[in-house]
């Protein structure tokens, strides 16, 4: 995608007779030169370290002890684990993969329908871009000039309400 955008922009500049290699290089460097954008690779690194260290299993163990004993408790565990993972890593895909790898086999062995279990875990993964720290919040804040801390504060209540709604409808 990045190469396609770069080539389209270069073709447009060439067609409009505005092609200057120095301006293009300077724009590329200035676009990526942001202190706030450094948070994104560090979130990914933190997620990899947590996954390698076995923190994902421990994160699932906490909701398991809190609500796992209730009827339908594995569903509640899935949503709570997704919310906890979202508050740590900021990546929806990584959170969903970690929670699904641990909980879908457990839900299958507890005779939950596989499509319903996978749907719940996938729906829980959608909470990750809302609950801070969120990679999409950082990208949106940097590109629009909004305060990232205010975006983070604005995401707490909706993320909690989404999680509560998922647990109520399970």
Predicted feature locations:
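Alpha-helical transmembrane segments of multi-pass membrane transport proteins
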Residues: 1-170
């Amino acid at each position: 995608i990045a190469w396609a955008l770069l080539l389209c922009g270069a073709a447009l500049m060439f067609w409009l007779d505005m092609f200057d290699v120095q301006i293009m290089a300077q724009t590329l460097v200035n676009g990526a030169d942001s202190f706030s954008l450094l948070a994104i690779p560090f979130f990914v690194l933190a997620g990899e370290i947590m996954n390698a260290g076995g923190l994902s299993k421990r994160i699932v163990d906490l909701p398991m002890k809190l609500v796992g004993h209730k009827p339908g408790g594995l569903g509640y565990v899935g949503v709570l684990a997704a919310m906890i993972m979202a508050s740590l890593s900021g990546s929806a895909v990584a959170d969903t993969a970690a929670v699904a790898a641990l909980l879908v086999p457990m839900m299958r062995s507890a005779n939950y329908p596989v499509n319903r279990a996978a749907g719940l875990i996938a729906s829980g993964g959608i909470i990750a871009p809302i609950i801070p720290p969120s990679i999409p919040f950082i990208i949106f804040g940097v590109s629009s000039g909004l305060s990232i801390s205010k975006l983070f504060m604005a995401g707490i209540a909706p993320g909690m309400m989404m999680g509560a709604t998922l647990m109520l409808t399970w």
